UniProtKB/Swiss-Prot annotation:
It comes from the Eukaryota. CDD domains: RING-HC_TFB3-like (cd16573). Acts as a component of the general transcription and DNA repair factor IIH (TFIIH or factor B), which is essential for both basal and activated transcription, and is involved in nucleotide excision repair (NER) of damaged DNA. TFIIH as CTD kinase activity and DNA-dependent ATPase activity, and is essential for polymerase II transcription. Residues 314-346 are annotated as: Disordered. Its main location: nucleus. It holds the Pfam family zf-C3HC4_5. PROSITE patterns: ZF_RING_1, ZF_RING_2. It comes from Yarrowia lipolytica (strain CLIB 122 / E 150). One of its GO terms (molecular function) is zinc ion binding. It is found in: Nucleus. Keywords: Metal-binding, Nucleus, Transcription, Transcription regulation, Zinc, Zinc-finger. This is RNA polymerase II transcription factor B subunit 3. GO terms for biological process: DNA repair; nucleotide-excision repair; regulation of transcription by RNA polymerase II. The gene is TFB3. Residues 325-335 have a biased composition (Basic and acidic residues).
Length: 346
């Protein structure tokens, strides 16, 4: 005898006689009926629900397979998905954790009202959600897209972790098999040398153990387990401002330069290096060396790190603040005598 859950309430067909029969529900009223009844009753357009006392207008394309046996659970899951697809703000969009928790509580209150509220409360809340969805459509779409990307990332990470665990398991099995083979080979080698060699038994045993230890060490290097985690790049919201680290001293740049490099300086240390063939092969030039020395000497003059930080926080620059202007024109050096000790690393 079939249970009531296996009988279509419309056509009274039984799953006992038709094992392939599928039951469908419509989110409008969640009344169950078989797939054949849906095809037969709703083939020509929307029709009133055939259940006694239900006046909901149903459409064929809204029917779906019932996942949960309890219709109340099925309804709650659908309502929750609907509400959270619209009210989908993220924690980083709130100033404090309390604000985010209040937002989550509002979502739960909305779900409870749609499930257990009066008809007027449900209608009012439905209109409110529809108005919010219309007003924040672009934001909702962006958050849903970001959530899908994060779900995809988590799935990829989980799949990768499974592959790594499987690979590590196979590698451990292979390592264990190789260790057993080496152990048996060492025993055979020990017996063979004891039978054929004239050396002392203790020295033979030590030599065999050393050989086995070398093989074991080499095998351990070859069978290193793969890491069980990977640095996955988290999906982040796109921003017009590049997320680059802050570097002081005007972004490691000094524009305009506070010096001019002359063609010649009286320097007895660096000048001989220009005639060294080893330095010439590496692209060494006197002017480049002098420019580097002067840059190090003048680097950071007129730059206020605190001013740069303030400009960075206020968004007035891209991490590069204009240094404090100290003179109208760059400093011109009239062939100073620069005594710098340079040690060649070549």
């Amino acid at each position: 005898m079939s249970e009531d859950g296996d009988i279509c309430p419309i056509c009274k067909s039984s799953r006992y006689l038709n094992p392939d029969m599928k039951f469908l529900v419509n989110p409008q009223c969640y009344h169950k009926m078989c797939e054949s009844c849906v095809d037969r009753l709703f083939a020509y357009g929307p029709v009133t629900c055939p259940h006694n006392g239900c006046e909901k207008i149903l459409r064929k394309n809204k029917f779906k397979t019932q996942i949960f046996e309890d219709v109340a659970v099925e309804k709650e899951v659908d309502v929750r998905q609907r509400v959270m697809s619209v009210m989908n703000k993220r924690e980083d969009e709130f100033d404090t954790l309390n604000d985010y928790n209040a937002y989550l509580e509002k979502i739960e209150d909305s779900i409870f009202t749609l499930l257990n509220g009066t008809a007027d409360e449900k209608d009012a809340l439905t209109k409110e959600i529809e108005a919010y969805e219309k007003e924040h459509k672009a934001e909702i779409i962006a958050n849903n897209k970001l959530r899908d990307e994060e779900d995809k990332y988590e799935q990829q990470k989980e799949d990768w972790m499974k592959e790594q665990r499987k690979a590590n398991y196979l590698m451990a099995v292979e390592e264990q098999r190789a260790a057993q083979e080496d152990k048996e080979a060492a025993k055979r080698e020990l017996v063979h040398q004891l039978a054929t060699s004239n050396k002392d038994a203790s020295s033979i045993e030590q030599n065999v153990q050393k050989t086995a230890l070398k093989r074991s060490s080499a095998r351990t290097v070859n069978f290193q387990p793969m890491p069980t985690s990977r640095y996955f790049e988290k999906v982040k919201k796109e921003s017009s401002k590049p997320e680059t680290p802050f570097t002081p001293f005007n972004g490691d740049r000094q524009i305009p330069a506070l010096f001019e490099v002359q063609d010649h300086y009286d320097d007895k240390v660096i000048e001989p290096l220009a005639h060294d063939i080893q330095h010439q092969a590496g692209g060494f030039t006197l002017k480049a060396a002098y420019a580097r020395i002067l840059q190090q000497a003048f680097f950071g003059l007129g730059v206020d790190v605190q001013t740069e930080l303030l400009a960075e926080e206020n968004g007035n620059s891209n991490g590069t603040a204009v240094p404090v202007k100290t003179e109208e024109d760059p400093v011109k050096l009239e062939e100073p005598s620069i005594q710098v000790k340079v040690e060649s690393t070549v």
